[in-house]
UniProtKB/Swiss-Prot annotation:
This is Histidinol-phosphate aminotransferase. One of its GO terms (biological process) is L-histidine biosynthetic process. Homodimer. The gene is hisC. Coiled coil: none annotated. The modification N6-(pyridoxal phosphate)lysine is found at residue 214. GO terms for molecular function: histidinol-phosphate transaminase activity; pyridoxal phosphate binding. Belongs to the class-II pyridoxal-phosphate-dependent aminotransferase family. Histidinol-phosphate aminotransferase subfamily. The keyword Ribonucleoprotein does not apply.
């Protein structure tokens, strides 16, 4: 710690991202990256943009990208906000829409960046326990008596559990909380869920956030977006323009547009991930693992007779990395990214050997 740090920095507990080790022949199944490459059209667009034009600032509004997203999801460009990955979009949403006198509510087991944002921006919050099956209970997010939330946020599918909430339950939560903004974090929705974006037209308090990092294979490019009522988008723009007027560079805009427009590549690769996930879930179950139903590009699993931390360590010794969370209620679970068929087969074979 430094004497020059502000009081806010002294009190922060920063988010810890999944590690990115540089090891040869590594089977990397710890950070939910797409096992297949980006759209060839996106790569071509990025290469074409890598020209003398890089001496010029990018479009501060990223209008081409907003238009592509709007067309893809059947909304208006003025209902779209874009940012440097969905983490930045979420950060702006916390500051612009979720900081109020009443506390923000989100699940106790969820994306661990949420409490970090609250600490950074001084947002009061309360966590709501998942049920015994690690599902979000919609009734827990409805006002009870005079107690109403200052905001609500949760991923759908949830992370790290992979559990999916039906769209009907999401709409019930949004409709039941007209006093606040409800943010649905849909980083993994393309792997088995139904997006809440169509509900935006009917609910001015709903903001839906997505990313191109997962289903569009562009984690290294950092492109995220939100869809919501123009009033919510204006609030996000105000925060963005008070922080960084040029969050997306020329390469990100060009690659993002092409990735959004390449529907064939998107559908083919996401369906491949879904098929592999189902095989992996069945293979893990055959080894005695308890596997939660997943609508994401990962599985959340535990073995009833083996310590999760020790399993992760033994896999690592075999050059296979998975994610282990040292957190109450889930310390005996592993989150395993769905890789290629070959990577998942190597994982299953390693676990079979460990369990002998």
């Amino acid at each position: 710690m430094s004497q020059y740090w502000s009081a806010v920095v002294h009190g922060l507990t920063p988010y810890v991202p999944g590690e990115q080790p540089k090891l040869a022949n590594l089977v990397k199944l710890n950070t939910n990256e797409h096992p297949y490459g980006p759209s060839p059209r996106a790569l071509a667009a990025i290469r074409a943009e890598a020209s003398d034009a890089l001496r010029l600032y990018p479009d501060p509004h990223a209008d081409r990208l907003k238009a592509a997203i709007a067309t893809r999801f059947g909304v208006e460009p003025r209902e779209v906000f874009v940012g440097n990955g969905s983490d930045e979009v979420l950060a702006h949403a916390f500051m612009a829409l979720l900081k109020h006198e009443r506390p923000l509510r989100f699940p106790d087991i969820s994306y661990s960046f949420y409490p970090v944002y609250c600490g950074l921006y001084g947002i009061a919050f309360e966590t709501v326990p998942l049920d015994d099956d690690f599902a979000i209970r919609p009734d827990d997010y409805l006002p009870h008596g005079s107690v109403a939330a200052g905001g609500i946020i949760f991923p759908n599918p949830n992370a790290p559990t992979g559990r999916l909430m039906p769209l009907s339950d999401i709409e019930r939560i949004v409709a039941g909380n007209p006093q606040c903004v409800v943010v649905i974090d849909e980083a993994y929705v393309d792997f088995g869920g139904e997006s809440a974006i169509p509900l935006v037209r009917h609910h001015p308090n709903l903001l839906v956030v997505q990313t191109l990092s997962k289903s569009r294979s562009l984690a290294g490019l950092r492109v995220g977006f939100a869809v919501g009522n123009p009033d919510l988008i204006e609030a996000l723009d105000r925060v963005k323009d008070s922080f960084n007027s040029y969050p997306l560079d020329r390469l990100a805009i060009a690659g993002g547009v092409a990735a959004i427009e390449d529907e064939e590549h998107f559908q083919r690769t996401r369906m491949a991930v879904i098929a592999t996930r189902e095989r992996l879930s069945a293979d893990l179950a055959s080894l005695g693992f308890d596997v939660l139903p997943s609508a994401a590009n990962f599985v959340f699993t535990r073995h009833p007779h083996r310590d999760a931390g020790e399993l992760a360590a033994q896999l690592r010794r075999r050059a296979i990395i998975v994610r282990h969370f040292r957190q109450p209620r889930i310390e005996q679970f592993l989150r395993i990214t769905v890789g290629t068929d070959e990577q998942c087969a190597a994982l299953v074979e390693a676990l079979r050997d460990i369990l002998r």
